[in-house]
UniProtKB/Swiss-Prot annotation:
Pfam families: DUF1846, DUF1846_C. Gene3D superfamilies: dip2346 domain like (3.10.630.10), Domain of unknown function (DUF1846), C-terminal subdomain (3.40.140.40). HAMAP family: UPF0371. It comes from the Bacteria. This is UPF0371 protein cu0538. Belongs to the UPF0371 family. InterPro entries: DUF1846, DUF1846_C, DUF1846_N.
Length: 497
């Protein structure tokens, strides 16, 4: 568990907004800004750059809000695949709606959604487009372009970008964002630049991608943590070969930017006679690397994130009964930074509980390094027991104090099993917290324990079995960073999610 501040949030907000305005002046017209990563809930960045808050990027954009219009992209194939945003456990299409709501709530203009790689045979995407229109949003349909991005002659023509719908916008700074990677943000930006040129409107493109950080070494743990996070896409960090050739300097980029750069350069040269960019790095505006205040702290935080990503990959493969392709990729990244599962202290502690009791176990590391464990009993699941134990410790209560009496737990178990059809009588984390809240009406100890919930944010947890969706959701809402062993507590073919 990493504690401390390794990133200067205020410096970042100032530097980044200034640099975007500088790029706008250089372009001298409409700027399409591809915004990679999460705009207002970038939890990955907040984990690997301690001090970077999840809303850091949107806070920066609020400095120039009156000039900004936001366009949300969604890959139609992700709808067909049922892709889910892992940190929130919601499908990409629902996250697209959530994004629109949150942007609007913060005062940003957002009226357009682009469905990329759309085919008429994709009935889910076609139906979603109709749903968006019923909700009052404008939907642009972008088709699959054969040979994209390598066949530049076709792509930059009426038979390529020319077939895409044009997105009507009214501001000079258009931020293009998406629920996740691979959504078609770059293609949308380039398509818009093409259409603006046909309409006689000067327009340019820039990229705001937090990771990889161009001015950190290729195999810096923070950059490798990004590689681990996108292992399912097979993204890899690379030295920008175009930048090296143009300037003789080694900087970090990643494979998809390098692959698509010839298309960008060709597009700009074809439209305007020249390209202002000689490399993928040139087109970026990322100032994150200039705001790291404690490199060692960020390195350690990134190593911990890579280990978490490894466990996540293992669990995903077990849940979906897929091969070990993704976890193997993350394992390679983990070895590059010299990390292992042993570096996550809660792993050994949780496994020791299971070895000792023969039942699922869990462990939590508090901010001061104290390890709190939980075991499975007739009344409580191990996660619920661990949660109560942690709250007691934080509240300074004796271990032998019962925050919940067996008499208060048994009626809840009866309700679960006899009336609600549950096969597991043990209380989950949500049920324990509700019971604790009820007890707080009369118990000062329970009230003291509840007040400590805020101190669990950022704590690491490990469980020896895969968590159910309820426990996952509770830990996520508390800000707890959970990993699990890739196995279930009971054998079954059907798993409720």
């Amino acid at each position: 568990m990493t504690h401390g501040i390794g990133f200067d949030r205020d410096k970042y907000i100032q530097l980044q907004s200034e640099h975007i305005n500088e790029r706008r002046e250089q372009i001298g017209g409409k700027l399409y800004l591809e915004m990679g990563g999460k705009l207002f809930d970038d939890y990955h960045a907040s984990r690997v750059l301690p001090g970077f808050t999840p809303d850091n990027k949107i806070a920066m954009l609020e400095n120039i809000k009156e000039d900004v219009e936001i366009v949300v992209c969604l890959n139609a194939r992700d709808l067909e695949r049922g892709k889910v945003r892992a940190d929130l456990s919601i499908p990409y299409e629902e996250d697209a709606l959530r994004l629109v709501d949150v942007f609007r709530d913060r005062g940003f203009r957002v009226n357009n959604v682009v469905l990329t790689q759309l085919e008429d045979s994709n009935h889910m995407a076609v139906a979603f487009a109709e749903r968006l229109e019923r909700l009052g949003l404008n939907v642009a349909r972008h088709r699959v372009i054969p040979g994209y991005p390598t066949n530049t002659e076709l792509v930059v023509s009426d038979g390529g970008f020319g077939l895409n719908d044009y997105v009507e916008t009214s501001r000079d700074l258009v931020v293009v964002t998406a629920p996740g990677p691979g959504s078609g943000k770059l293609a949308t930006c380039l398509s818009q630049v093409y259409h603006e040129f046909r309409r006689g409107v000067p327009a340019g493109y820039a990229k705001f991608e937090t990771f990889p950080i161009w001015n950190l070494p290729l195999e810096h743990p923070v950059n490798l943590a990004y590689e681990a996070a996108t292992a399912d896409l097979d993204d890899i960090n690379v030295i920008d070969p175009f930048h090296l050739q143009a300037y003789g300097k080694q900087v970090t980029s990643y494979n998809r930017d390098v692959e698509v750069f010839p298309l960008l350069k060709t597009l700009l040269e074809k439209l305007y006679g020249h390209s202002p960019y000689q490399s993928p790095t040139d087109m970026g505006v990322n100032m994150v690397g200039h705001c790291i205040s404690d490199d060692e702290l960020c390195r350690e935080a990134a190593k911990q994130e890579i280990v978490r990503r490894y466990y996540k990959a293992l669990v995903d493969e077990r849940r979906e009964d897929t091969d070990d392709t993704v976890s193997s990729r993350v394992a390679i990244v983990m070895s590059k930074v010299g990390a292992s599962t042993k570096d996550r202290r809660v792993v050994a502690a949780a496994n020791e509980v299971e070895e000792r009791t023969g039942e699922p176990g869990s462990a939590l590391e508090l901010a001061d390094g104290t390890i709190i464990t939980g075991k499975t009993s007739e009344l409580l699941g191990c996660s619920a027991a661990m949660l109560l134990n942690a709250l007691k410790h934080l509240a300074g209560l004796d271990d032998d104090i019962h925050l919940l009496s067996p008499k208060s737990i048994e009626p809840i178990q009866t309700l679960k099993v006899d009336h609600l059809g549950s096969q597991n009588p043990r209380l989950h984390t949500d049920e324990v917290l509700i019971a604790l809240s009820v007890s707080a009406a009369e118990s000062e100890d329970a009230r003291a324990a509840l007040k400590q919930l805020k101190n669990l944010a950022g704590c690491d947890v490990h469980t020896t079995t895969i968590l159910g969706s309820v426990d996952e959701g509770i830990f996520r809402n508390l800000g707890v960073l959970v990993t699990s062993e890739p196995k279930y507590w009971r054998k079954a073919l059907y798993r409720k999610r």
